[in-house]
């Protein structure tokens, strides 16, 4: 699979970058659309999305570089070449989350409400962004056979793309992309439930993505390691536990209080 979309000599455009940008655009558009329901000004949400993306990319790259330091210790310039791959999504989630918490606290906005609004855009962005790994021939699973891939009824271009230097590999990028897509669809319906409470959509995201990533990570051959443990699996366990705690805490009390869709009590948020 050719990772380069366009090579004009003076500029090279990688498929990885295109898929990441496409995921950011679609995810960001959904966040902006949902924020309008809550009377959140475009200036506020644009600034929030911009800062979260910046810090999210920094965090995702930082986690990858830290656990792959031997690869960059003698090639510091390579650290900034994110278009070649090497973004650890968990690092991006953590730094992006911290950015949102600080930003919302600064402007005295309900942090939980903002997190609930953004997770739908985040998970569909992840579903799309994973295809960047496909074009980079990375984030794949163990070696397999052509017959196995054909039994999955995959499109021909995916099967051909999983033939890397003469060996077929399991498309774990696709497993995660589909998992995120299913989570996206569930979230769309879940947060429209009458009794859905503030904080529950983000709790569902933590649980759903954590479970999927934990098992999919076990198949990957390029996991970042901390001793004998896969970093992504450790963080996924943390996400699942955190999500369960949030879900339980937010479920307490009257079903009619602190509802996500209680727009009547929403005050306009301006930057």
Residue ranges and their predicted role:
Residues 1-271:
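A feature for loop-to-transmembrane-helix boundaries and adjacent hydrophobic helices
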